[in-house]
Amino acid sequence: MNDVSVEYQAIEEKDVLLASKADDCHPIFRRAPSSVEFNKLRKRLLRHMRQALDDFSMLSTGKKWLVALSGGKDSYGLLALLLDLKWRGLLPVEILACNLDQGQPGFPKHILPDFLSSYKIPYRIEYQDTYSIVTDKLAQTQTYCSLCSRLRRGNLYRIAREEGCSALILGHHRDDVLETFFMNLFHGGRLAAMPGKLKNDEGDLFVLRPLVYAAEEDMEKFSQAMQFPIIPCNLCGSQDGLQRNAMKEMLKNIERQMPGRKDTMIRALANVRPSHLLDKKFFDFKTY
């Protein structure tokens, strides 16, 4: 049986609001740069997030959200931007940050609790040794990412239910969406990407991706400027040579040769014409 431990920190909402008013920002931004360049970046990311929240009616999904926090640049940025909107009065939901420690060797257990506590962010950290499950089931030559991700998602769903959350919030950005689209196209033989909003198979939880319009490059710059204590995603040593890396390089080359194509591709995913494709399930060619 897997060892399971849970760590909580709960705070009164008013404590965060009082701290925010004191410095005219959420505490997480107290050490943020004051440069014009950073402010433009921050506003751009907030604009993209607000657009996604509106386009996919994310605010209709309930009043308490579980925000997945892996310790990577995207999840840190996601949490900070959500807290920024909440402080501005534009996000009327309760936020609970959640990290699932999957037992990966060398995982620095102190980083996330120290970070979240220092900014009085409500959080839950749970230990579930899914790493051992993955290594037992797969050969060393196989990529762990897919099974690891499925086990992580299942545990996050369970935690969301236990905490009374209506939605699980993930940090996938524009580039993740496009890479997934091309992976499905080239390797899965289907047209599919990552939706901004969906329901889980059981139908009791929403999965939201407020960063679907945000560029990875912007998230990288934001993370560096905010000096988040990044936890690398190569602890298990299974990241090299993945198909996703090939898609990432392909998209970089396309963007280098034809700037602006990534944004065009994202717009295309929201402008589908079933009659111009070949799928009979989505268009009745017999009566056309």
From Swiss-Prot:
GO terms for biological process: tRNA thio-modification. Keywords: 4Fe-4S, ATP-binding, Cytoplasm, Iron, Iron-sulfur, Magnesium, Metal-binding, Nucleotide-binding, RNA-binding, Transferase, tRNA processing, tRNA-binding. It is an enzyme of class 2 (transferase). The keyword tRNA processing applies. Binds 1 [4Fe-4S] cluster per subunit. The cluster is chelated by three Cys residues, the fourth Fe has a free coordination site that may bind a sulfur atom transferred from the persulfide of IscS. The keyword tRNA processing applies. It is found in: Cytoplasm. A motif (PP-loop motif) lies at residues 70-75. The thiolation reaction likely consists of two steps: a first activation step by ATP to form an adenylated intermediate of the target base of tRNA, and a second nucleophilic substitution step of the sulfur (S) atom supplied by the hydrosulfide attached to the Fe-S cluster. Belongs to the TtcA family. NCBIfam families: PRK10696.1. This is tRNA-cytidine(32) 2-sulfurtransferase. The gene is ttcA.
